Amino acid sequence: MAGRSGDSDEELLRTVRLIKLLYQSNPPPSPEGTRQARRNRRRRWRERQRQIRSISGWILSTYLGRSAEPVPLQLPPLERLTLDCSEDCGNSGAQGVGSPQILVESPAVLDSGTKE
């Protein structure tokens, strides 16, 4: 399977190029025309996008043996997350600028999805 450790990435790159070509073959609709014409073009475009999405999923699962959907990430409970704004907050004069740190109580939170 391409993309796995020890395997060639050629098949993965070829598959990505094919999926990219599919999406490029369906550009967004033009904003010209009457409201009804624009609505119809958007509706047809969305339907083609849905078809491309399903074809892309089929290509990924058939040629690469993997799911089109990402593996869900197990996140810790929100009650255990805190924002630490002790660094770089208010120093620059612009509110909301900077990257607040997210502190997690303990790394053991990410180990299992069961509650204690």
From Swiss-Prot:
Subcellular location: Host nucleus, Host nucleolus; Host cytoplasm
Phosphoserine: residues carrying this PTM: S5, S8, S92, S99
Motif (Nuclear export signal and binding to XPO1): 73-84
GO cellular component, one term: host cell nucleolus
Renumbered residue ranges of the record's region Homomultimerization: 18-26
InterPro entries documented for this protein: REV_protein
Keyword DNA repair among UniProt keywords: no
Highest taxon above the source species: Viruses
Gene3D superfamilies given in the database record: 6.10.140.630
Maturation and modification: Asymmetrically arginine dimethylated at one site by host PRMT6. Methylation impairs the RNA-binding activity and export of viral RNA from the nucleus to the cytoplasm.
Signal peptide interval: none
Keywords: AIDS, Host cytoplasm, Host nucleus, Host-virus interaction, Methylation, mRNA transport, Phosphoprotein, RNA-binding, Transport
One MF annotation (Gene Ontology) recorded for this entry: DNA-binding transcription factor activity
Region Disordered, residue ranges: 23-48, 90-116
Coiled coil: none
Quaternary structure and partners: Homomultimer; when bound to the RRE. Multimeric assembly is essential for activity and may involve XPO1. Binds to human KPNB1, XPO1, TNPO1, RANBP5 and IPO7. Interacts with the viral Integrase. Interacts with human KHDRBS1. Interacts with human NAP1; this interaction decreases Rev multimerization and stimulates its activity. Interacts with human DEAD-box helicases DDX3 and DDX24; these interactions may serve for viral RNA export to the cytoplasm and packaging, respectively.
Domain comment, as recorded: The RNA-binding motif binds to the RRE, a 240 bp stem-and-loop structure present in incompletely spliced viral pre-mRNAs. This region also contains the NLS which mediates nuclear localization via KPNB1 binding and, when the N-terminal sequence is present, nucleolar targeting. These overlapping functions prevent Rev bound to RRE from undesirable return to the nucleus. When Rev binds the RRE, the NLS becomes masked while the NES remains accessible. The leucine-rich NES mediates binding to human XPO1.
Note from the entry: HIV-1 lineages are divided in three main groups, M (for Major), O (for Outlier), and N (for New, or Non-M, Non-O). The vast majority of strains found worldwide belong to the group M. Group O seems to be endemic to and largely confined to Cameroon and neighboring countries in West Central Africa, where these viruses represent a small minority of HIV-1 strains. The group N is represented by a limited number of isolates from Cameroonian persons. The group M is further subdivided in 9 clades or subtypes (A to D, F to H, J and K).
UniProt similarity note: Belongs to the HIV-1 REV protein family.
Function comment: Escorts unspliced or incompletely spliced viral pre-mRNAs (late transcripts) out of the nucleus of infected cells. These pre-mRNAs carry a recognition sequence called Rev responsive element (RRE) located in the env gene, that is not present in fully spliced viral mRNAs (early transcripts). This function is essential since most viral proteins are translated from unspliced or partially spliced pre-mRNAs which cannot exit the nucleus by the pathway used by fully processed cellular mRNAs. Rev itself is translated from a fully spliced mRNA that readily exits the nucleus.
The name this protein goes by in its record: Protein Rev
Species of the source: Human immunodeficiency virus type 1 group M subtype B (isolate ARV2/SF2) (HIV-1)
Gene transcribed to yield this protein: rev
